[in-house]
Amino acid sequence: MPQGTVKWFNAEKGFGFIAPEDGSADVFVHYTEIQGTGFRTLEENQKVEFEIGHSPKGPQATGVRSL
């Protein structure tokens, strides 16, 4: 499962980007893909693992879990 670091995440808008550890292009992340209960958000520089899915706008992180 790919891992990366949260580049930025806007909690008000519910989305942001993850920089994958392998150096590939940043991946879009939507709050609905963050695993867990309650308020789902990510912090800048937080380490995460995720799968890569595809949306009409390109690659998107799915099943995002904090490490």
Swiss-Prot record:
What biological process terms from GO does the record include? Answer: regulation of gene expression
- Any one GO CC term of the record: peptidoglycan-based cell wall
What PANTHER family does this protein map onto? COLD SHOCK DOMAIN CONTAINING PROTEINS
Q: What is its main location?
A: cytoplasm
Outline the extent of the CSD domain: 4-64
This one is known as Probable cold shock protein A
Q: List the keywords (alphabetical).
A: Activator, Cytoplasm, DNA-binding, Transcription, Transcription regulation
What Pfam families does the annotation carry?
CSD
MF terms per GO, please? DNA binding; nucleic acid binding
Q: Which organism is it from?
A: Mycobacterium tuberculosis (strain ATCC 25618 / H37Rv)
List where in the cell it is found: Cytoplasm
| InterPro entries linked | Cold_shock_CspA, Cold_shock_domain, CSD, CSD_CS, CSP_DNA-bd, NA-bd_OB-fold
Gene3D superfamilies for the chain:
Nucleic acid-binding proteins
